[in-house]
């Protein structure tokens, strides 16, 4: 593969495709749901609810990265409205996101693209300064 072919690949392809995004999602959700600082966001969620949310995240990320998925969930603002997500909660999310990307050895370029994409969503998700 030439350097030009690498540059022409979508982020989805460069991340390793659907299975890689699904594995990273599982890792990230495990980190978030196990962190005492933010685990209460999942308090009371049934196993079915968690599975559905996980699949929506995988589809959202796959579509956003240029992959063959169609996200059918609500927009980020509506999905997170009323959750009272704070700047501190967001910082924990970003910390775990970076740790997940590092865990999977995601190269710097792709790591920055993913984290930059997450940052672009912050205004739709964080409700408390």
Model-derived regions, located:
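Core of compact, soluble alpha-helical bundle domains
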Residues: 1-129
């Amino acid at each position: 593969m030439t350097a030009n072919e690498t540059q022409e690949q979508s982020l989805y392809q460069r991340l390793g495709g659907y299975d890689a995004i699904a594995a990273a999602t599982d890792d990230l959700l495990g980190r978030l749901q196990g962190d005492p600082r933010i685990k209460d966001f999942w308090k009371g969620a049934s196993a079915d609810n968690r599975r559905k949310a996980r699949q929506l995240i995988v589809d959202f990320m796959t579509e956003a990265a240029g992959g063959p998925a169609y996200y059918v969930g609500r927009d980020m603002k509506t999905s997170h409205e009323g959750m009272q997500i704070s700047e501190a909660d967001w910082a924990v999310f970003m910390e775990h996101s970076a740790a997940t990307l590092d865990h999977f050895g995601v190269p710097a370029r792709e790591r920055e693209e993913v984290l930059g994409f997450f940052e672009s969503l912050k205004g739709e998700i964080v409700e408390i300064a």
